[in-house]
């Protein structure tokens, strides 16, 4: 089954809603954003969650030491590096975060524009992180745009990335289009924020459940094809 993360969790009700819907992980944004959550709030939410649920903190251009302190203080099981953290720093992040999941976000448009030299920096460091997440950031906004990137254009690139890393697809996913994303990319995971909200950081119960159901159905369909 495709791993499913509901990102931008800001309150316990939404966390329980996503957990009950069948999400595998929740995301907590600590970088400046309309969906930002304070560490104290996130820690209280995480303390109330089942242990099997992933708790992923989203950070931007924080040092390995700062990220490690955040993970320890809040109780995170993983970190999503959403900024410009270079490939040659991945070893330092891994050393600072033993036993925790590390996801490195790359912006799809940047990947397409920069080409293989840009990707090779992360390919050479792939042993130090657990997944590449492809997102559709915009100028001044590193995620949560609600706009998908060009799936057809980047599909061949995703196939190459999958040769050396687990891949998570994000960026403009909704209950209506996530099945198509699963069919096109056959990713290890998918990640959604604005596509299941009725306002920034406020989850819509029916949309969350519909999203998780759509992922499950699409994953089962892909399994039958294999």
List each language-model region with its residue ranges:
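Proline-aspartate-enriched helix->loop->beta-strand connector
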Residues: 75-76, 187-190
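Extreme N-terminal starter segment of soluble prokaryotic enzymes
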Residues: 1-5
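Conserved, mostly hydrophobic/aromatic
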Residues: 18, 79, 132, 150, ...
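Well-formed, non-transmembrane alpha-helical positions, independent of function
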Residues: 17-20, 44, 69-73, 92, ...
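A C-terminal functional module that forms or caps the active site or interfaces directly
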Residues: 160, 168-183, 197
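C-terminal helical cap(s) of enzyme catalytic domains, especially alpha/beta-barrels
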Residues: 40-49, 91-93, 193-226
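Conserved anion-binding
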Residues: 25, 30-34, 41, 48-168
């Amino acid at each position: 089954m495709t791993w499913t993360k509901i990102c931008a969790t800001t309150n316990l009700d939404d966390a329980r809603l996503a957990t009950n819907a069948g999400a595998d992980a929740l995301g907590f944004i600590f970088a400046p954003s309309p969906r930002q959550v304070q560490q104290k709030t996130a820690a209280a939410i995480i303390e109330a969650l089942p242990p099997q649920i992933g708790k992923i903190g989203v950070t931007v251009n924080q040092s390995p030491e700062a990220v490690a302190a955040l993970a320890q203080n809040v109780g995170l099981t993983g970190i999503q590096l959403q900024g410009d953290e270079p490939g040659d720093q991945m070893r330092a992040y891994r050393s600072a975060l033993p036993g925790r999941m590390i996801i490195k976000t790359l912006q799809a448009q940047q990947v397409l524009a920069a080409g293989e030299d840009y990707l090779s920096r992360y390919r050479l460091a792939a042993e130090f992180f657990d997944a590449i997440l492809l997102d559709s950031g915009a100028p001044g906004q590193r995620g949560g745009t609600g706009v998908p990137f060009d799936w057809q254009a980047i599909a061949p690139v995703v196939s190459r990335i999958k040769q050396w890393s687990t891949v998570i697809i994000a960026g403009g996913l909704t209950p209506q289009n996530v099945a198509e994303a699963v069919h096109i990319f056959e990713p290890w995971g998918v990640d959604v924020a604005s596509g299941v909200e009725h306002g920034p950081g406020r989850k819509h119960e029916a949309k969350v459940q519909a999203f998780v159901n759509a992922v499950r159905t699409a994953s089962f369909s892909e399994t039958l094809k294999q």
